[in-house]
């Protein structure tokens, strides 16, 4: 990935993300994420029937040192449990930022809020176009589902699609896959 052009103000426009807004220089390692992505994923968990879902994610840069993030999902399977194709599923929103690590490598910090009583922070690494969010703390309300930990992996596949996998430890069950998806870019 190219380092992009830096302006005197300390912000930069990425050569890889063709966003028309300035990308803060600290976010260059995440430049490949900027834009809107859409696609399909599969979900499941121990004791849960597998399902398909649709998803749209936007990573937005506005010149400040964090990307805004919002994800919407919808049911993409046969009707089940009162859900029809297109019925809204999980939404999450938050911010992604990059800080210099002790060894000089960029550290990614991701703050997410979920509408079902859970907020979480991930800390991880970015290596080229692969992001490992492997440290996670999660807080939840007394009525939220019993999720204790989660890890995520994001990356570009075949140079253009955004793929991710999310594993979680929930309801006393061991860490295992809950979601994975592959999304294509629909706008910069
Ligand atoms: C792409 C985003 C997501 C989608 C499409 C999704 C979808 C689903 C669906 C369809 C179910 C089963 C039906 C239901 O109980 O509602 C489910 C269960 C669950 N989800 Fe998610 N989910 C998403 C994100 C998350 C996240 C971020 C967490 C945790 C922070 C989470 C935690 C859970 C838990 C704990 C269960 C119950 C598992 C069990 O019954 O043992 N989900 N999810």
From Swiss-Prot:
Cofactor(s) for this UniProt protein: heme b
Residues bound to heme b: 178
The enzyme's E.C. designation: 5.99.-.-
Species for this entry: Frankia casuarinae (strain DSM 45818 / CECT 9043 / HFP020203 / CcI3)
Keyword Transit peptide appears in the UniProt entry: no
Motif GXWXGXG, residue range(s) on this chain: 35-41
Protein name: Peroxynitrite isomerase
Family statement drawn from the similarity comment of this UniProt entry: Belongs to the nitrobindin family.
GO molecular function: heme binding; metal ion binding; peroxynitrite isomerase activity
Domain notes: Forms a 10-stranded antiparallel beta-barrel structure able to accommodate a hydrophobic ligand in its interior. In fact, this fold hosts the heme group, which is located in a wide surface cleft.
Keywords, in A-Z order: Heme, Iron, Isomerase, Metal-binding
Subunit structure: Homodimer.
Catalyzed reaction equations: peroxynitrite = nitrate
Matches recorded under Pfam families: THAP4_heme-bd
Cofactor binding, per record: Binds 1 heme b group per subunit, that coordinates a highly solvent-exposed Fe(III) atom.
InterPro entries on file: Calycin, Nb(III)_bact/plant, Nitrobindin, THAP4-like_heme-bd
Role of this protein: Heme-binding protein able to scavenge peroxynitrite and to protect free L-tyrosine against peroxynitrite-mediated nitration, by acting as a peroxynitrite isomerase that converts peroxynitrite to nitrate. Therefore, this protein likely plays a role in peroxynitrite sensing and in the detoxification of reactive nitrogen and oxygen species (RNS and ROS, respectively). Is able to bind nitric oxide (NO) in vitro, but may act as a sensor of peroxynitrite levels in vivo.
Pathway membership: Nitrogen metabolism
Keyword Zinc-finger: no
């Amino acid at each position: 990935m190219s380092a992009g052009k830096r302006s005197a103000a300390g912000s930069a426009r990425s050569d890889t993300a063709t966003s028309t807004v300035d990308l803060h220089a600290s976010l260059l390692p995440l430049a490949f994420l900027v834009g809107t992505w859409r696609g399909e994923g599969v979900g499941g968990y121990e004791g849960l029937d597998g399902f398909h879902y649709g998803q749209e994610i936007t990573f937005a840069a506005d010149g400040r040192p964090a990307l805004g993030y919002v994800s919407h999902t919808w049911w993409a399977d046969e009707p089940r449990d009162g859900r029809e194709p297109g019925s809204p599923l999980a939404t999450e929103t938050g911010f992604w930022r990059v800080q210099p690590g002790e060894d000089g490598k960029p550290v990614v910090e991701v703050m997410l809020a979920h509408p079902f009583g859970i907020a979480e922070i991930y800390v991880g690494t970015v290596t080229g176009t692969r992001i490992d969010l492997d440290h996670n703390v999660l807080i939840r309300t007394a009525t939220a589902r019993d999720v204790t930990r989660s890890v995520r992996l994001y990356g570009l596949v075949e140079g253009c699609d955004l793929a991710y996998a999310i594993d979680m430890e929930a309801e006393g069950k061991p860490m295992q896959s809950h979601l994975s998806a592959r999304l294509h870019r629909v706008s910069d």
